[in-house]
Amino acid sequence: MGLSTVPDLLLPLVLLELLVGIYPSGVIGLVPHLGDREKRDSVCPQGKYIHPQNNSICCTKCHKGTYLYNDCPGPGQDTDCRECESGSFTASENHLRHCLSCSKCRKEMGQVEISSCTVDRDTVCGCRKNQYRHYWSENLFQCFNCSLCLNGTVHLSCQEKQNTVCTCHAGFFLRENECVSCSNCKKSLECTKLCLPQIENVKGTEDSGTTVLLPLVIFFGLCLLSLLFIGLMYRYQRWKSKLYSIVCGKSTPEKEGELEGTTTKPLAPNPSFSPTPGFTPTLGFSPVPSSTFTSSSTYTPGDCPNFAAPRREVAPPYQGADPILATALASDPIPNPLQKWEDSAHKPQSLDTDDPATLYAVVENVPPLRWKEFVRRLGLSDHEIDRLELQNGRCLREAQYSMLATWRRRTPRREATLELLGRVLRDMDLLGCLEDIEEALCGPAALPPAPSLLR
Protein backbone atom coordinates (compact mmCIF):
# COMPACT_ATOMS: atom_id res chain seq x y z
CA MET A 1 0.00 0.00 0.00
CA GLY A 2 2.94 2.22 0.68
CA LEU A 3 4.35 1.49 -2.83
CA SER A 4 1.12 2.51 -4.48
CA THR A 5 1.15 5.87 -2.69
CA VAL A 6 4.54 6.99 -3.98
CA PRO A 7 3.67 6.93 -7.72
CA ASP A 8 0.65 9.11 -6.97
CA LEU A 9 2.83 11.85 -5.42
CA LEU A 10 5.50 11.76 -8.11
CA LEU A 11 3.12 12.48 -10.97
CA PRO A 12 2.20 16.02 -9.95
CA LEU A 13 5.82 16.89 -9.22
CA VAL A 14 6.90 15.77 -12.67
CA LEU A 15 4.20 17.88 -14.33
CA LEU A 16 5.23 21.00 -12.41
CA GLU A 17 8.86 20.62 -13.41
CA LEU A 18 7.89 20.25 -17.05
CA LEU A 19 5.87 23.49 -16.96
CA VAL A 20 8.73 25.47 -15.48
CA GLY A 21 11.11 24.27 -18.08
CA ILE A 22 8.83 24.92 -21.04
CA TYR A 23 7.67 28.54 -20.16
CA PRO A 24 10.55 30.12 -18.27
CA SER A 25 10.22 33.51 -19.99
CA GLY A 26 6.45 33.75 -19.40
CA VAL A 27 6.82 33.26 -15.71
CA ILE A 28 9.63 35.79 -15.49
CA GLY A 29 7.43 38.36 -17.39
CA LEU A 30 4.69 38.13 -14.83
CA VAL A 31 6.95 39.53 -12.07
CA PRO A 32 8.59 42.94 -12.97
CA HIS A 33 12.24 43.55 -12.54
CA LEU A 34 13.28 45.14 -9.25
CA GLY A 35 15.02 48.13 -10.93
CA ASP A 36 12.02 49.02 -13.10
CA ARG A 37 9.74 48.93 -10.07
CA GLU A 38 11.93 51.48 -8.21
CA LYS A 39 11.99 53.86 -11.19
CA ARG A 40 8.23 53.71 -11.62
CA ASP A 41 7.59 54.46 -7.98
CA SER A 42 10.11 57.29 -7.73
CA VAL A 43 8.74 60.97 -7.39
CA CYS A 44 10.15 63.94 -9.32
CA PRO A 45 11.61 66.85 -7.30
CA GLN A 46 9.58 69.96 -6.50
CA GLY A 47 8.84 72.08 -9.56
CA LYS A 48 8.88 69.10 -11.97
CA TYR A 49 6.45 66.44 -13.10
CA ILE A 50 6.75 62.88 -14.59
CA HIS A 51 6.67 62.70 -18.37
CA PRO A 52 3.33 61.10 -19.28
CA GLN A 53 4.94 58.75 -21.83
CA ASN A 54 8.28 58.02 -20.18
CA ASN A 55 8.31 57.61 -16.43
CA SER A 56 12.03 58.03 -16.29
CA ILE A 57 11.86 61.66 -17.45
CA CYS A 58 10.93 64.61 -15.18
CA CYS A 59 9.92 67.77 -17.00
CA THR A 60 9.92 71.30 -15.56
CA LYS A 61 6.47 72.73 -14.70
CA CYS A 62 5.18 75.89 -16.38
CA HIS A 63 5.14 79.16 -14.41
CA LYS A 64 1.87 80.82 -13.30
CA GLY A 65 0.25 82.73 -16.12
CA THR A 66 1.31 80.03 -18.64
CA TYR A 67 0.11 76.55 -19.59
CA LEU A 68 1.75 73.33 -20.97
CA TYR A 69 1.89 73.30 -24.74
CA ASN A 70 4.35 70.33 -25.21
CA ASP A 71 6.22 68.12 -22.77
CA CYS A 72 9.97 68.25 -22.59
CA PRO A 73 11.66 66.05 -25.27
CA GLY A 74 14.12 64.52 -22.82
CA PRO A 75 15.90 64.90 -19.52
CA GLY A 76 17.41 68.34 -18.97
CA GLN A 77 15.42 69.94 -21.78
CA ASP A 78 12.87 72.76 -21.37
CA THR A 79 9.14 72.27 -21.38
CA ASP A 80 7.21 74.15 -24.07
CA CYS A 81 4.94 76.61 -22.13
CA ARG A 82 2.65 79.28 -23.62
CA GLU A 83 1.10 82.41 -21.98
CA CYS A 84 -2.60 82.34 -21.16
CA GLU A 85 -4.97 84.25 -23.39
CA SER A 86 -7.23 87.11 -22.25
CA GLY A 87 -10.05 85.90 -20.01
CA SER A 88 -8.02 82.95 -18.67
CA PHE A 89 -5.37 82.46 -16.01
CA THR A 90 -3.19 80.06 -14.06
CA ALA A 91 -2.47 81.09 -10.50
CA SER A 92 0.46 78.72 -9.75
CA GLU A 93 3.08 76.40 -11.32
CA ASN A 94 1.31 73.80 -13.42
CA HIS A 95 1.43 71.38 -16.31
CA LEU A 96 -2.14 72.03 -17.45
CA ARG A 97 -2.96 71.72 -21.10
CA HIS A 98 -5.34 74.75 -20.97
CA CYS A 99 -5.65 77.87 -18.80
CA LEU A 100 -8.56 78.30 -16.40
CA SER A 101 -11.42 80.68 -17.28
CA CYS A 102 -11.75 83.88 -15.21
CA SER A 103 -14.57 84.08 -12.69
CA LYS A 104 -17.31 86.76 -12.79
CA CYS A 105 -18.80 88.54 -9.80
CA ARG A 106 -22.50 87.85 -9.28
CA LYS A 107 -24.40 91.10 -9.03
CA GLU A 108 -27.59 89.34 -7.96
CA MET A 109 -25.74 88.30 -4.79
CA GLY A 110 -24.62 91.87 -4.13
CA GLN A 111 -20.99 91.14 -5.09
CA VAL A 112 -18.71 93.82 -6.49
CA GLU A 113 -15.42 93.42 -8.37
CA ILE A 114 -12.48 94.36 -6.19
CA SER A 115 -9.74 93.51 -8.74
CA SER A 116 -10.03 92.36 -12.34
CA CYS A 117 -8.72 89.09 -13.74
CA THR A 118 -5.11 88.80 -15.01
CA VAL A 119 -3.13 85.94 -16.59
CA ASP A 120 -1.77 84.94 -13.18
CA ARG A 121 -4.72 85.83 -10.93
CA ASP A 122 -8.45 85.22 -10.97
CA THR A 123 -11.07 87.94 -10.49
CA VAL A 124 -11.41 89.02 -6.85
CA CYS A 125 -15.00 89.64 -5.74
CA GLY A 126 -16.15 91.14 -2.48
CA CYS A 127 -18.77 93.33 -0.78
CA ARG A 128 -19.24 97.07 -0.40
CA LYS A 129 -18.34 99.08 2.69
CA ASN A 130 -20.43 98.30 5.79
CA GLN A 131 -21.35 94.89 4.36
CA TYR A 132 -20.31 91.35 5.21
CA ARG A 133 -20.18 88.00 3.38
CA HIS A 134 -22.64 85.23 4.12
CA TYR A 135 -21.43 81.97 2.53
CA TRP A 136 -24.02 79.58 1.12
CA SER A 137 -21.33 77.14 -0.01
CA GLU A 138 -17.54 76.94 -0.06
CA ASN A 139 -17.17 79.50 -2.86
CA LEU A 140 -20.61 81.10 -3.15
CA PHE A 141 -21.34 84.05 -0.88
CA GLN A 142 -23.91 86.84 -0.66
CA CYS A 143 -23.42 90.39 0.64
CA PHE A 144 -25.62 91.77 3.45
CA ASN A 145 -25.60 95.14 5.23
CA CYS A 146 -24.01 95.24 8.65
CA SER A 147 -26.45 95.68 11.53
CA LEU A 148 -26.55 99.17 13.07
CA CYS A 149 -27.59 97.85 16.50
CA LEU A 150 -30.57 100.18 16.82
CA ASN A 151 -32.01 100.09 20.35
CA GLY A 152 -28.79 98.45 21.48
CA THR A 153 -25.00 98.72 21.63
CA VAL A 154 -22.25 97.19 19.47
CA HIS A 155 -20.60 94.25 21.19
CA LEU A 156 -18.40 93.17 18.23
CA SER A 157 -17.87 95.30 15.15
CA CYS A 158 -18.83 94.11 11.68
CA GLN A 159 -16.12 92.09 9.90
CA GLU A 160 -15.59 90.71 6.41
CA LYS A 161 -17.28 87.38 7.09
CA GLN A 162 -19.27 88.20 10.23
CA ASN A 163 -22.12 90.57 10.99
CA THR A 164 -22.13 93.01 13.92
CA VAL A 165 -22.83 91.42 17.29
CA CYS A 166 -25.34 93.57 19.21
CA THR A 167 -26.39 93.83 22.85
CA CYS A 168 -29.97 95.08 23.19
CA HIS A 169 -31.23 97.61 25.72
CA ALA A 170 -33.75 96.78 28.40
CA GLY A 171 -37.18 96.16 26.92
CA PHE A 172 -35.75 94.79 23.64
CA PHE A 173 -34.68 91.34 22.50
CA LEU A 174 -32.38 90.13 19.71
CA ARG A 175 -34.06 88.67 16.62
CA GLU A 176 -32.05 88.08 13.44
CA ASN A 177 -29.33 90.32 14.83
CA GLU A 178 -31.79 93.22 15.31
CA CYS A 179 -33.11 94.61 18.59
CA VAL A 180 -36.91 94.29 18.56
CA SER A 181 -39.29 95.71 21.14
CA CYS A 182 -40.61 93.29 23.73
CA SER A 183 -44.14 94.24 22.68
CA ASN A 184 -43.57 92.02 19.62
CA CYS A 185 -42.55 89.07 21.77
CA LYS A 186 -44.83 86.03 21.87
CA LYS A 187 -44.96 83.47 24.64
CA SER A 188 -43.82 80.68 22.33
CA LEU A 189 -40.54 82.39 21.47
CA GLU A 190 -37.31 82.42 23.43
CA CYS A 191 -37.63 86.18 23.92
CA THR A 192 -39.81 85.52 26.97
CA LYS A 193 -36.59 84.88 28.92
CA LEU A 194 -35.30 88.38 28.10
CA CYS A 195 -38.58 90.28 28.21
CA LEU A 196 -39.72 89.96 31.83
CA PRO A 197 -43.36 90.68 32.76
CA GLN A 198 -42.26 93.24 35.39
CA ILE A 199 -40.75 95.44 32.70
CA GLU A 200 -44.03 95.45 30.78
CA ASN A 201 -45.98 96.37 33.92
CA VAL A 202 -43.68 99.28 34.72
CA LYS A 203 -43.90 100.54 31.17
CA GLY A 204 -47.69 100.34 31.23
CA THR A 205 -47.80 102.29 34.49
CA GLU A 206 -45.59 105.05 33.08
CA ASP A 207 -47.72 105.32 29.94
CA SER A 208 -50.95 105.59 31.95
CA GLY A 209 -49.42 108.26 34.22
CA THR A 210 -48.28 110.27 31.23
CA THR A 211 -51.73 110.01 29.68
CA VAL A 212 -53.33 111.49 32.81
CA LEU A 213 -50.76 114.19 33.57
CA LEU A 214 -50.37 115.59 30.06
CA PRO A 215 -53.94 116.96 29.74
CA LEU A 216 -53.72 118.44 33.26
CA VAL A 217 -50.48 120.24 32.43
CA ILE A 218 -52.00 121.62 29.23
CA PHE A 219 -55.17 122.74 31.06
CA PHE A 220 -53.32 124.56 33.85
CA GLY A 221 -50.97 126.13 31.31
CA LEU A 222 -53.91 127.56 29.37
CA CYS A 223 -55.46 128.87 32.60
CA LEU A 224 -52.21 130.58 33.55
CA LEU A 225 -51.90 132.20 30.12
CA SER A 226 -55.51 133.42 30.34
CA LEU A 227 -54.93 135.03 33.74
CA LEU A 228 -51.74 136.64 32.48
CA PHE A 229 -53.56 138.04 29.44
CA ILE A 230 -56.38 139.46 31.60
CA GLY A 231 -53.85 141.05 33.94
CA LEU A 232 -52.02 142.68 31.05
CA MET A 233 -55.27 144.05 29.62
CA TYR A 234 -56.19 145.49 33.03
CA ARG A 235 -52.76 147.03 33.40
CA TYR A 236 -52.94 148.44 29.88
CA GLN A 237 -56.05 150.46 30.76
CA ARG A 238 -54.17 151.98 33.71
CA TRP A 239 -51.02 152.64 31.70
CA LYS A 240 -52.90 154.05 28.72
CA SER A 241 -53.35 157.53 30.19
CA LYS A 242 -49.74 157.72 31.39
CA LEU A 243 -48.42 156.51 28.04
CA TYR A 244 -50.53 159.05 26.16
CA SER A 245 -49.27 161.83 28.44
CA ILE A 246 -45.63 160.80 27.97
CA VAL A 247 -45.82 160.57 24.17
CA CYS A 248 -48.14 163.50 23.39
CA GLY A 249 -47.29 165.81 26.30
CA LYS A 250 -50.93 166.14 27.39
CA SER A 251 -53.60 164.22 29.23
CA THR A 252 -55.81 161.65 27.53
CA PRO A 253 -59.10 163.01 26.21
CA GLU A 254 -61.99 162.13 28.47
CA LYS A 255 -65.39 161.04 27.33
CA GLU A 256 -67.95 163.69 26.49
CA GLY A 257 -70.12 162.82 29.47
CA GLU A 258 -67.23 163.08 31.90
CA LEU A 259 -66.17 166.40 30.34
CA GLU A 260 -69.66 167.80 30.81
CA GLY A 261 -69.64 166.64 34.42
CA THR A 262 -66.46 168.57 35.16
CA THR A 263 -67.87 171.82 33.69
CA THR A 264 -69.60 173.43 36.66
CA LYS A 265 -69.82 177.01 35.44
CA PRO A 266 -69.58 178.85 32.12
CA LEU A 267 -66.26 180.23 31.03
CA ALA A 268 -65.63 183.90 31.62
CA PRO A 269 -65.61 185.79 28.33
CA ASN A 270 -62.32 187.23 27.21
CA PRO A 271 -62.48 191.00 26.82
CA SER A 272 -60.14 190.93 23.88
CA PHE A 273 -62.29 188.42 21.97
CA SER A 274 -65.40 189.59 20.08
CA PRO A 275 -67.14 186.78 18.19
CA THR A 276 -69.01 187.36 14.97
CA PRO A 277 -72.69 188.31 15.41
CA GLY A 278 -74.96 185.31 15.30
CA PHE A 279 -72.26 182.97 16.66
CA THR A 280 -73.37 180.88 19.61
CA PRO A 281 -70.73 178.65 21.29
CA THR A 282 -71.80 175.18 22.39
CA LEU A 283 -71.39 173.68 25.84
CA GLY A 284 -67.81 172.70 26.56
CA PHE A 285 -66.50 174.51 23.49
CA SER A 286 -63.50 176.78 23.82
CA PRO A 287 -62.69 179.18 20.97
CA VAL A 288 -58.99 178.67 21.65
CA PRO A 289 -57.42 175.34 20.47
CA SER A 290 -56.32 172.99 23.25
CA SER A 291 -52.77 173.01 21.92
CA THR A 292 -52.58 176.71 22.88
CA PHE A 293 -54.97 177.09 25.83
CA THR A 294 -56.74 174.87 28.31
CA SER A 295 -60.32 175.01 29.63
CA SER A 296 -59.25 177.24 32.53
CA SER A 297 -59.74 181.01 32.44
CA THR A 298 -57.14 183.48 31.21
CA TYR A 299 -54.06 183.29 33.40
CA THR A 300 -50.86 185.29 33.77
CA PRO A 301 -47.96 184.75 36.16
CA GLY A 302 -48.76 188.00 37.93
CA ASP A 303 -52.23 186.74 38.90
CA CYS A 304 -50.95 183.70 40.83
CA PRO A 305 -51.91 185.01 44.32
CA ASN A 306 -55.50 185.62 43.22
CA PHE A 307 -55.89 182.31 41.38
CA ALA A 308 -58.43 180.29 43.37
CA ALA A 309 -59.53 177.62 40.89
CA PRO A 310 -58.39 174.01 41.61
CA ARG A 311 -55.65 172.45 39.54
CA ARG A 312 -56.75 171.33 36.11
CA GLU A 313 -57.21 167.55 35.93
CA VAL A 314 -58.49 167.02 32.34
CA ALA A 315 -58.08 168.90 29.11
CA PRO A 316 -60.92 169.12 26.55
CA PRO A 317 -60.30 167.52 23.17
CA TYR A 318 -59.11 169.68 20.35
CA GLN A 319 -61.99 171.15 18.34
CA GLY A 320 -61.57 172.87 15.05
CA ALA A 321 -63.19 176.29 14.69
CA ASP A 322 -65.96 177.08 12.21
CA PRO A 323 -65.18 179.36 9.27
CA ILE A 324 -66.89 182.29 11.03
CA LEU A 325 -64.86 181.68 14.17
CA ALA A 326 -61.68 181.33 12.15
CA THR A 327 -62.33 184.76 10.62
CA ALA A 328 -62.83 186.24 14.05
CA LEU A 329 -59.65 184.64 15.33
CA ALA A 330 -57.69 185.95 12.37
CA SER A 331 -59.00 189.49 12.88
CA ASP A 332 -58.54 189.48 16.65
CA PRO A 333 -55.90 186.90 17.69
CA ILE A 334 -56.00 185.68 21.26
CA PRO A 335 -52.65 185.76 23.03
CA ASN A 336 -51.11 182.50 24.24
CA PRO A 337 -49.62 182.10 27.74
CA LEU A 338 -46.14 183.06 26.57
CA GLN A 339 -47.43 186.25 24.94
CA LYS A 340 -49.31 187.13 28.12
CA TRP A 341 -46.08 186.78 30.12
CA GLU A 342 -44.26 189.00 27.69
CA ASP A 343 -47.07 191.63 27.75
CA SER A 344 -47.42 191.49 31.53
CA ALA A 345 -46.34 194.45 33.61
CA HIS A 346 -44.28 192.18 35.79
CA LYS A 347 -40.66 191.48 35.01
CA PRO A 348 -39.56 187.93 34.05
CA GLN A 349 -39.21 185.79 37.11
CA SER A 350 -35.77 184.27 37.62
CA LEU A 351 -35.38 180.76 38.97
CA ASP A 352 -34.59 180.61 42.69
CA THR A 353 -31.20 178.95 43.08
CA ASP A 354 -31.88 177.97 46.66
CA ASP A 355 -35.31 176.47 45.93
CA PRO A 356 -35.08 173.08 44.08
CA ALA A 357 -38.89 172.86 43.87
CA THR A 358 -38.78 174.96 40.69
CA LEU A 359 -36.44 172.52 38.94
CA TYR A 360 -38.39 169.49 40.17
CA ALA A 361 -41.58 171.04 38.77
CA VAL A 362 -39.92 171.24 35.35
CA VAL A 363 -38.63 167.64 35.66
CA GLU A 364 -42.06 166.26 36.55
CA ASN A 365 -43.99 168.01 33.77
CA VAL A 366 -41.73 167.54 30.74
CA PRO A 367 -42.36 164.18 29.00
CA PRO A 368 -39.45 161.74 29.54
CA LEU A 369 -39.39 160.87 25.84
CA ARG A 370 -38.81 164.55 24.99
CA TRP A 371 -36.42 165.30 27.85
CA LYS A 372 -33.12 164.95 25.95
CA GLU A 373 -34.43 167.19 23.19
CA PHE A 374 -35.44 169.72 25.86
CA VAL A 375 -32.01 169.90 27.55
CA ARG A 376 -30.21 169.92 24.18
CA ARG A 377 -32.20 173.01 23.25
CA LEU A 378 -31.12 174.54 26.58
CA GLY A 379 -27.49 174.10 25.53
CA LEU A 380 -26.32 170.81 27.13
CA SER A 381 -24.13 168.55 25.02
CA ASP A 382 -24.66 164.82 24.56
CA HIS A 383 -21.47 164.15 26.51
CA GLU A 384 -22.80 166.04 29.53
CA ILE A 385 -26.17 164.31 29.27
CA ASP A 386 -24.55 160.85 29.22
CA ARG A 387 -22.21 161.74 32.08
CA LEU A 388 -25.05 162.90 34.32
CA GLU A 389 -27.11 159.82 33.48
CA LEU A 390 -24.19 157.58 34.51
CA GLN A 391 -23.70 159.49 37.74
CA ASN A 392 -27.38 159.01 38.61
CA GLY A 393 -27.97 155.70 36.88
CA ARG A 394 -30.40 154.33 39.42
CA CYS A 395 -32.71 157.39 39.47
CA LEU A 396 -33.75 159.06 36.24
CA ARG A 397 -35.46 161.89 38.12
CA GLU A 398 -32.25 162.89 39.89
CA ALA A 399 -30.33 162.70 36.61
CA GLN A 400 -32.80 165.11 35.00
CA TYR A 401 -32.56 167.42 38.02
CA SER A 402 -28.75 167.40 37.70
CA MET A 403 -29.05 168.40 34.04
CA LEU A 404 -31.23 171.40 34.92
CA ALA A 405 -28.87 172.36 37.75
CA THR A 406 -25.93 172.25 35.34
CA TRP A 407 -27.81 174.48 32.88
CA ARG A 408 -28.75 176.91 35.67
CA ARG A 409 -25.13 177.21 36.89
CA ARG A 410 -23.73 178.02 33.47
CA THR A 411 -26.56 180.45 32.56
CA PRO A 412 -26.53 184.04 33.93
CA ARG A 413 -29.08 184.55 36.68
CA ARG A 414 -31.03 187.19 34.76
CA GLU A 415 -31.42 184.81 31.78
CA ALA A 416 -32.43 181.66 33.74
CA THR A 417 -36.12 182.54 33.72
CA LEU A 418 -39.43 180.86 33.01
CA GLU A 419 -39.59 182.95 29.85
CA LEU A 420 -36.59 181.09 28.43
CA LEU A 421 -38.10 177.72 29.35
CA GLY A 422 -41.40 178.82 27.80
CA ARG A 423 -39.72 179.65 24.51
CA VAL A 424 -38.02 176.25 24.41
CA LEU A 425 -41.27 174.43 25.21
CA ARG A 426 -43.09 176.51 22.58
CA ASP A 427 -40.51 175.51 19.97
CA MET A 428 -41.09 171.89 21.01
CA ASP A 429 -44.88 172.38 20.75
CA LEU A 430 -45.29 171.52 24.47
CA LEU A 431 -47.21 174.55 25.78
CA GLY A 432 -49.46 172.20 27.74
CA CYS A 433 -46.44 171.17 29.78
CA LEU A 434 -45.65 174.84 30.40
CA GLU A 435 -49.09 175.41 31.92
CA ASP A 436 -48.60 172.37 34.16
CA ILE A 437 -45.33 173.87 35.40
CA GLU A 438 -47.08 177.17 36.19
CA GLU A 439 -49.82 175.45 38.14
CA ALA A 440 -47.27 173.35 40.03
CA LEU A 441 -45.39 176.51 41.08
CA CYS A 442 -48.40 178.77 41.83
CA GLY A 443 -51.01 176.19 42.83
CA PRO A 444 -50.18 175.84 46.58
CA ALA A 445 -50.36 179.63 47.15
CA ALA A 446 -53.70 179.88 45.39
CA LEU A 447 -55.48 177.22 47.40
CA PRO A 448 -58.24 178.57 49.73
CA PRO A 449 -57.63 178.37 53.47
CA ALA A 450 -60.58 176.02 54.01
CA PRO A 451 -60.60 173.20 51.42
CA SER A 452 -64.00 172.11 50.21
CA LEU A 453 -64.98 168.66 48.95
CA LEU A 454 -65.47 168.29 45.21
CA ARG A 455 -68.64 166.63 44.04
UniProtKB/Swiss-Prot annotation:
<comment type="subunit">
    <text>(Microbial infection) Interacts with mumps virus protein SH; this interaction inhibits downstream NF-kappa-B pathway activation.</text>
</comment>
<keyword id="KW-0053">Apoptosis</keyword>
<dbReference type="GO" id="GO:0003177">
    <property type="term" value="P:pulmonary valve development"/>
</dbReference>
<dbReference type="GO" id="GO:0010614">
    <property type="term" value="P:negative regulation of cardiac muscle hypertrophy"/>
</dbReference>
<dbReference type="InterPro" id="IPR033993">
    <property type="entry name" value="TNFRSF1A_N"/>
</dbReference>
<dbReference type="Pfam" id="PF00020">
    <property type="entry name" value="TNFR_c6"/>
</dbReference>
<feature type="disulfide bond">
    <location>
        <begin position="44"/>
        <end position="58"/>
    </location>
</feature>
<feature type="region of interest" description="N-SMase activation domain (NSD)">
    <location>
        <begin position="338"/>
        <end position="348"/>
    </location>
</feature>
<keyword id="KW-0325">Glycoprotein</keyword>
<dbReference type="GO" id="GO:0007259">
    <property type="term" value="P:cell surface receptor signaling pathway via JAK-STAT"/>
</dbReference>
<feature type="topological domain" description="Extracellular">
    <location>
        <begin position="30"/>
        <end position="211"/>
    </location>
</feature>
<keyword id="KW-0677">Repeat</keyword>
<dbReference type="GO" id="GO:0003176">
    <property type="term" value="P:aortic valve development"/>
</dbReference>
<feature type="repeat" description="TNFR-Cys 2">
    <location>
        <begin position="83"/>
        <end position="125"/>
    </location>
</feature>
<feature type="glycosylation site" description="N-linked (GlcNAc...) asparagine">
    <location>
        <position position="151"/>
    </location>
</feature>
<feature type="disulfide bond">
    <location>
        <begin position="84"/>
        <end position="99"/>
    </location>
</feature>
<feature type="topological domain" description="Cytoplasmic">
    <location>
        <begin position="233"/>
        <end position="455"/>
    </location>
</feature>
<feature type="repeat" description="TNFR-Cys 3">
    <location>
        <begin position="126"/>
        <end position="166"/>
    </location>
</feature>
<dbReference type="GO" id="GO:0043235">
    <property type="term" value="C:receptor complex"/>
</dbReference>
<keyword id="KW-0945">Host-virus interaction</keyword>
<protein>
    <recommendedName>
        <fullName>Tumor necrosis factor receptor superfamily member 1A</fullName>
    </recommendedName>
</protein>
<dbReference type="InterPro" id="IPR052493">
    <property type="entry name" value="TNFRSF1A"/>
</dbReference>
<dbReference type="GO" id="GO:0005615">
    <property type="term" value="C:extracellular space"/>
</dbReference>
<comment type="subunit">
    <text>Binding of TNF to the extracellular domain leads to homotrimerization. The aggregated death domains provide a novel molecular interface that interacts specifically with the death domain of TRADD. Various TRADD-interacting proteins such as TRAFS, RIPK1 and possibly FADD, are recruited to the complex by their association with TRADD. This complex activates at least two distinct signaling cascades, apoptosis and NF-kappa-B signaling. Interacts with BAG4, BABAM2, FEM1B, GRB2, SQSTM1 and TRPC4AP. Interacts directly with NOL3 (via CARD domain); inhibits TNF-signaling pathway.</text>
</comment>
<dbReference type="GO" id="GO:0038023">
    <property type="term" value="F:signaling receptor activity"/>
</dbReference>
<dbReference type="InterPro" id="IPR011029">
    <property type="entry name" value="DEATH-like_dom_sf"/>
</dbReference>
<dbReference type="GO" id="GO:0019221">
    <property type="term" value="P:cytokine-mediated signaling pathway"/>
</dbReference>
<feature type="glycosylation site" description="N-linked (GlcNAc...) asparagine">
    <location>
        <position position="145"/>
    </location>
</feature>
<feature type="disulfide bond">
    <location>
        <begin position="146"/>
        <end position="158"/>
    </location>
</feature>
<dbReference type="GO" id="GO:0006954">
    <property type="term" value="P:inflammatory response"/>
</dbReference>
<feature type="disulfide bond">
    <location>
        <begin position="127"/>
        <end position="143"/>
    </location>
</feature>
<dbReference type="GO" id="GO:0072659">
    <property type="term" value="P:protein localization to plasma membrane"/>
</dbReference>
<dbReference type="GO" id="GO:0006366">
    <property type="term" value="P:transcription by RNA polymerase II"/>
</dbReference>
<dbReference type="GO" id="GO:1902339">
    <property type="term" value="P:positive regulation of apoptotic process involved in morphogenesis"/>
</dbReference>
<feature type="glycosylation site" description="(Microbial infection) N-beta-linked (GlcNAc) arginine">
    <location>
        <position position="376"/>
    </location>
</feature>
<feature type="signal peptide">
    <location>
        <begin position="1"/>
        <end position="29"/>
    </location>
</feature>
<feature type="disulfide bond">
    <location>
        <begin position="168"/>
        <end position="179"/>
    </location>
</feature>
<keyword id="KW-0675">Receptor</keyword>
<dbReference type="GO" id="GO:0002947">
    <property type="term" value="C:tumor necrosis factor receptor superfamily complex"/>
</dbReference>
<dbReference type="InterPro" id="IPR000488">
    <property type="entry name" value="Death_dom"/>
</dbReference>
<dbReference type="GO" id="GO:0043120">
    <property type="term" value="F:tumor necrosis factor binding"/>
</dbReference>
<dbReference type="GO" id="GO:0008625">
    <property type="term" value="P:extrinsic apoptotic signaling pathway via death domain receptors"/>
</dbReference>
